[in-house]
């Protein structure tokens, strides 16, 4: 993909070179490139098994004439790891790729994917066009992707009836989503040229391994990563374009505007953010208005479903509704009553109100912090709050948090604890699905406690991010960079003159 003469591949190549310009304009030297075995206590402890970190006076391999010190540079290693993880994910899903799901095999082998299930449920196998022929529960750009990949497969199947259309559709989607997954790793590398090993947290993520093609979320994750890169490089209009595209694919990228708003208030710098919002709005409208005008009922299905949807698996509200109380009793009465309203008005008001309170707290944190927080830190906190208090927390939503977690707090210890909790939830969720299908494999409390573990680890990770904001000298990114490599127009910006007045507000 080309953006103002720059390709995603060249971005990763830039990160390959330790002498490439840093985000703050300085030229990193090899000594300025972070080495986790030195800077991360968890990795340093693991490195003792192979002799410990590289010594201060160790001789590094000579640089080649092509700019890299050797072929397997950190960037190439990370990109290879991302490809490996996504390839292994494809293998892990292989028992389900033929679409012949019998005797709950899609749950027994942990290989269920909405991509294949919805190929038939949304009538893509019949050549129908999303929004035109029927309503789709996803935002417009995701529906367009479904149709753009489904129609060619249907046409091929018409010519060759021996083709398994479900398998072909899944494989094609896995390829496209894999490209966006690798592109996300490339964007993280481009944003962290002095910290290339941070991107390995994304590339090696167990959550990426188990969830990459459960749904089309990697499509929006990749577009969001492009948005963050364009913003960091001071291209607000291009950032707005990608923000509009990402929001047209999944609604969650819109939440990142809240982080930009908090930084704009703190610095009194508004122009770049307003350009981005304007470009994003124009892009979103250009994609949505034609569909909304001609196929209003189909277009509005996404909003109707989200408004009327009840308590979903694994959320805070599900935990309250099914909390084990002993004696075979489950659920707190007040939580159970929330799900009785067919329109779920009380539930919507409550979760949205709690989310707004959390956003207000994040804004106060951004204004009262001793140093301006980084964009990725605030973005992670806003999105984490949305998931913690939301009424839907699907297993693949972990992909939303992954890049932001890496950019917000690149420390392996807590990150791996969170990933372990996500894997526990993944396994428990498939057991829960089998139970819902009449083949119980464990008591309800097992899934409830897996849900609690996931929620708690996300909150703990958010707590560490808050701690880094309040004690910026502990922020690992600011130990490598002078300021915020993702900050864009806010990087190096002084606090607004009115900030002391805002801080004095109770």
Regions found by a protein language model. Name each.
Residues 273-355:
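Membrane-lumen/periplasm interface segments of specific transmembrane helices
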